[in-house]
């Protein structure tokens, strides 16, 4: 009689993880390990970007800051900034009502500037033939008194005269210069002559690239900030060695200060109501800072810095481990003991904690689990490289900042919004499809690795062991721990055990043949006995029918 056979089984790791992923074919597949690649959290603060503070304008607008609204004095001189923060509806904008020409274009320009240096180009004291201090308004109060924008000068007539102005400034700096000026549009003709003496006036501005002539538009208007008049402001970039020339006989708002663009770089004007959080980040959104190495986020579509890509998804999880189907109980099943990971295994091993794939053996010396370190390490390297590759490919650094349009460009704004929404939809679809496909490939990859490990053992053992169909092999010979180890490390000596295996196979086959012979003898005896009994019954019935006349019997 044979003793209980030694066995070796191929299996895979399982744990208590409840992480779930989606694949092309399935949803909510529980896996042993997974990695979230969608950032969903932020700190709710405005932070320094790579150590450089933002310029947070608080209650001031960009126009209020650049022109010098008296309520924005804290921004008269500002250090280098990483990005600019402006509220959606800042209180301190153009205190004197009017318009800022090409304002949106100026903001776009600021998205490529990190530092201004304010310099005086035409001193206020140089206007000896005009009144340079009387140009103030109650619309721009400071300390309870009428005031005006700090960086421009509202020139008024002096001694009932407004001589024609001819003034030039040559940019001798090495940097570009942002120059601002304006025109006043009075409420009526009386205000025109009261302020400028001349009833018909103009302003001419010229550079190597600019040729502008402005005339005031006198009209009756509703009061804003107590004013019926309006002011319109303009700007230009004056290149090094270029000159700007002004000529006017009235209504001129002259530049006193200009901004030297001393540092260009990636910046942005971000609309946000948040406060400064005394923190540092690599990625800022209007909702708060993101500190993450993930390739995607769903916090806000507008960002500045080294940011993940925005997608509309709520969940993006990459499978890194295996299907997690722990073996619940050890019982015989038609398809074996373990799990369907390789088509024939029905459950993972929680007892194997030091690897993804491995072995369980049992012999007279005992039983135990052992991970296959080589295949596990190769799999870990492969999955890690794949995840890192996905992150690297998707984590291209870029900015998505809001674009502003004036009232005449609403159709362009709507078209731009539709295009951006379309791009976001495409990115979201691509990200979700990428995750589904990679998860399918990862789980198939693990399946393949388990199958390869099984084939490695099968090819070594050949007919020295029997495949049980559940990931296990039953040896036809004694296999001690040294023998088991040789199977695991691929050095199993088939010839050494082949004779013992052959004898045991033959003994098992003999028992089967003997059982089959006995079965056949019993079958033949049973068939003959049944046939004889049937013949006797037929003969008896015939004799009885002949004796009572029911059947005529003739013997020839």
UniProtKB/Swiss-Prot annotation:
Glycosylation is annotated at 15-16, 28, 170, 291, 489
Q: Where in the cell is it found?
A: Virion membrane; Host apical cell membrane
- Print the keywords alphabetically: Clathrin- and caveolin-independent endocytosis of virus by host, Clathrin-mediated endocytosis of virus by host, Disulfide bond, Fusion of virus membrane with host endosomal membrane, Fusion of virus membrane with host membrane, Glycoprotein, Hemagglutinin, Host cell membrane, Host membrane, Host-virus interaction, Lipoprotein, Membrane, Palmitate, Transmembrane, Transmembrane helix, Viral attachment to host cell, Viral envelope protein, Viral penetration into host cytoplasm, Virion, Virus endocytosis by host, Virus entry into host cell
Protein origin, superkingdom: Viruses
Any one GO CC term of the record: virion membrane
Q: Which residues lie on this side of the membrane: Cytoplasmic?
A: 542-556
Question: What else does the entry mention about this protein?
Answer: Major glycoprotein, comprises over 80% of the envelope proteins present in virus particle.
Q: Which family does it belong to?
A: Belongs to the influenza viruses hemagglutinin family.
UniProt name for this protein: Hemagglutinin
Protein species of origin: Influenza A virus (strain A/Chicken/Hong Kong/715.5/2001 H5N1 genotype E)
The organism's lineage is:
Viruses, Riboviria, Orthornavirae, Negarnaviricota, Polyploviricotina
